[in-house]
């Protein structure tokens, strides 16, 4: 029953001797209706929306400038996510403005499309988060790295931005140029996306190489039937 119908029924019962009981009952039902089902629907829709809109963007709107507080909000996600043995060994270096040129010189994007020389001129990312580790890299550190990187990019999506994980970069030169105390493991580029990306369902064994056609970037994804082990 919709909210209007509940209100109309309450008004109708006001002259009835059972008004108090009916009023309390309907109010309780209304509270339940507003609380649990609606919250669950919003949560499910929100997660799916974020996952669908979170893509690996290589081109960004040059007219939009990422702010320091936006990078901080993204980095704050690290205080909320799990960490192996709760060691919390990852550290984060925000990069903006002129320093972005330093990072750009040491990263490589679009490895599967070398002929395009991505990103296109004028769409280069102008903000980054360099993720470092206070300890030697290990499988547990890499697990933490994956969790926090994905979570940060989802946060970026939620605030209207986008990004990409960059593993192809010159570690030692970047460490020296940014004067990093710890070894960099991953670079996140952040910005307002200027690309159209679509997912394409495919079967196991088919090509998984992303490609571009008429300005759209297509990303093959194996359908769920092939992902479930039986």
Language-model segments: which ranges?
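Acidic, surface-exposed loops and disordered segments
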Residues: 6-230
């Amino acid at each position: 029953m919709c909210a209007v119908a509940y209100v109309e029924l309450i008004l109708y019962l006001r002259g009835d001797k059972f008004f108090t009981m009916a009023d309390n009952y309907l109010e309780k039902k209304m509270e339940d209706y507003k609380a649990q089902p609606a919250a669950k629907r919003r949560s499910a829709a929100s997660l799916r929306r974020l996952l669908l809109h979170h893509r690996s963007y290589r081109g960004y709107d040059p007219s939009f400038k990422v702010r320091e507080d936006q990078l901080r909000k993204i980095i704050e996600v690290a205080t909320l996510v799990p960490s192996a043995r709760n060691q919390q060994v990852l550290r984060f270096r925000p990069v903006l403005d002129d320093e972005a040129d330093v990072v750009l010189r040491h990263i490589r994007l679009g490895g599967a499309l070398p002929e395009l020389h991505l990103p296109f001129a004028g769409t280069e990312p102008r903000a980054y988060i360099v993720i470092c580790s206070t300890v030697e890299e290990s499988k547990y550190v890499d697990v933490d790295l994956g969790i926090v990187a994905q979570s940060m990019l989802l946060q970026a999506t939620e605030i209207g931005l986008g990004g990409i994980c960059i593993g192809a970069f010159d570690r030692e030169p970047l460490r020296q140029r940014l004067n990093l105390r710890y070894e960099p493991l991953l670079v996140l580029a952040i910005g307002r996306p200027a690309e159209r990306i679509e997912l394409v369902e495919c079967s196991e064994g088919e090509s998984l190489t992303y490609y571009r056609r008429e300005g759209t970037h297509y990303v093959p994804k194996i359908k769920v039937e092939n992902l479930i082990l039986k």
